[in-house]
A protein has these predicted regions:
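C-terminal transmembrane helical hairpin of 12-TM major facilitator-type secondary transporters
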Residues: 272-316
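Hydrophobic core of transmembrane alpha-helices in multi-pass small-molecule transporters
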Residues: 25, 108-127, 296-313
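Central cavity-lining transmembrane alpha-helices of secondary-active solute carriers
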Residues: 54-73, 249-262
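Symmetry-related core transmembrane helices of the 12-TM Major Facilitator Superfamily/SLC fold
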Residues: 177-196, 374-398
């Protein structure tokens, strides 16, 4: 029996590791703050819901653009500099559109919005690949690296709840206009944290291919990649809807419960059980959405959904690490990140397309977010849940047991 239980090394929690973990949290939070602000402003400007979905989904494609160059860049140049410049690119992309419209009164067209999201995704992808796949691994001993990957991924996972929470708080205290500069400041905080960590100098490699799958994509993990994308599309459907502050608080609580459950409930459980239980919890959340009771929709549904996604995410991350061959740990981390973000962004983009009347333009700027409904994609979400469960139980899990290397 293979279990989830991971030993805890207290000497891993040194100052540099803390800095990089919080840099990961702040960087991803800056991106998820746009979950509310992008549809808000596009609805206010009269864009169609389909266009909103395209702009959001463009980010999920953008994260692949610079991945093939990651290995060359971190081996040819100082790896922390690559990460810092990438984070700076994210910060600039977050604030440039706000600056153009606010101070120069330049209205940006739909094509420009798509291009900016592609660029934003490209910088974010390179930043995460160099941070999670290289820098965090470099700060710990070899026997601590699985634990370091596991912990740092949880910091990024919590940003799914923290980003919209912070965005709503900024919206309530100031206005939605302030969200973009606040998100940019968070990215700059991540940049400062990475800059405070000292990395030993490594001589640049000369014979490195300009483009490669190293530190980018793990080909032998493709079945797992597809399974993760399908599951994250389900979460993306839900996150494409406007929600109250309470919903995101409960989503955060659900993620925290998943973290606790991994430590105490699944510590000695059979390997397959974690993903299956997670998918059952997601299905339960989908059935709760049929309820007309506000308590169930605002409290129980997001908690169940986050609990399911949280425990699935950690297990699939460890699957990816165990599929990696020698010197492929960074590649496995990047592949997991790509699958996670691609599925989420595609789900959000498709969610806007499936639900046509959620975001409506209003004469009152502060009331542009209206009419939360989610029955429209209950059937596709439940269908994807069933497909993901069957895929995992009959294809992915047997395949993983046959091909794992650790």
């Amino acid at each position: 029996m293979d279990t989830q239980n991971t030993p805890v090394h207290f000497n891993l929690w040194h100052r540099d590791f803390w800095r990089l973990c919080f840099a990961n949290l702040f960087l991803m939070t800056s991106i998820y703050m746009l979950l509310l602000s992008i549809p808000y402003f596009m609805a206010k400007e009269g864009y169609s819901v389909t266009q909103v979905g395209v702009v959001y989904a463009a980010y999920g494609l953008g994260i692949f653009l610079l991945g093939g160059f990651c290995s060359y860049l971190v081996q040819r140049y100082r790896r922390n500099r690559v990460c810092q410049i990438s984070i700076l690119g994210v910060a600039v992309s977050l604030v440039v559109l706000y600056y153009l419209e606010t101070f120069w009164n330049i209205k940006v067209g739909f094509e420009m919005l798509v291009a900016m999201r592609l660029i934003q995704g490209a910088f974010l992808g390179l930043a995460e690949m160099s941070l999670a796949s290289t820098l965090i691994i470099d700060t710990c001993e070899s026997f601590q690296r699985t634990e370091a990957n596991y912990i740092s991924s949880w910091f990024a996972r919590f940003s799914i709840a923290v980003g919209p929470l912070l965005s709503l708080l900024v919206y309530n205290v100031f206005s939605m206009n302030v969200v973009f500069p606040v998100a940019s400041v968070l990215a700059l905080v991540a940049l400062v944290l990475v800059s405070r960590v000292k990395f030993p100098f490594k001589a640049p490699s000369e014979n490195v291919s300009l483009i490669s799958s190293d530190r980018f994509f793990l080909p032998q993990g493709f079945p797992l990649f597809i399974n993760i994308v399908c599951i994250m599309v389900i979460l993306g459907f839900y996150l494409s809807l406007p929600h109250s502050l309470t919903v995101y608080v409960m989503f955060f609580c659900g993620l925290f419960l998943a973290l606790v459950a991994e430590k105490y409930v699944f510590a000695d459980a059979e390997l397959k059980s974690q993903v299956i239980v997670g998918l059952i919890l997601i299905a339960a959340a989908e059935f709760v959405s049929l309820s007309d009771q506000g308590f169930a929709e605002e409290m129980l549904l997001p908690a169940l959904l986050a609990l399911g996604v949280g425990i699935i995410g950690s297990r699939f991350l460890l699957f990816y690490i165990k599929l990696a061959k020698h010197c492929q740990r960074g590649t496995s981390m990047s592949s997991f990140f790509l699958a996670w973000e691609l599925g989420l962004s595609l789900g959000i983009g498709l969610g806007f397309w499936l639900v046509k009347d959620v975001y409506q333009k209003s004469p009152d700027v502060d009331m542009a977010i209206l009419n939360p409904v989610h029955e429209e994609f209950l059937y596709p979400a439940f269908g994807l849940t069933v497909v993901s469960l069957l895929m995992y139980n009959f294809l992915v899990h047997p395949w993983y047991m046959k091909h794992r290397n650790r």
